[in-house]
Amino acid sequence: MLTSHLDTLSLLSSLPGNLLWKVKPVAAEDYFGKTRFQASISNFFINTLLIRRKGEKDSEHDPIRKMLEAIDAGYSLILFPEGTRGKSEQMGKIKSGIARILSLRPEVKYIPVFMTGMGRSLPKGKMILLPYKASVYYGIPTLVKSTDTHEILDQITGDFEVMKEKYQVVIDEEEE
């Protein structure tokens, strides 16, 4: 569930420091790389892989190609399968990009991650952190069971639904 820019920072801060140099959060070039300076800052501080959301297929700007090249170079990617920030604490529809990548690299495991409280802690359009409890829950590293993109999307969606059910109990208890 992607609800704020805090998501990426929370994920990165939960990883061991010695792994950070091999992790690339995938980010929209039109937002995080509007200028060369902005792109440099994004790359320097969080090692982003900037992609064009509307990249031309079979070109140097093809987002799938850029992500596959990073995986082939040994990087782990942080992908937000919804593709954009959604409504706070609500899961949006998973887009096909992650399924296309995994269909081409079925030997690569994915780890579903479920987050809560991020949208309240840093609401969309705001610059000030608010003092709310936020949590990050990691799923199990998983291989896809098929190379069919529709089946992969169903598998990933199912993983998120299971995590949502499992951790919704925790969320409800925390709010009481």
Language-model features: where?
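Catalytic core of membrane glycerolipid acyltransferases/transacylases, capturing the structured
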Residues: 1-55
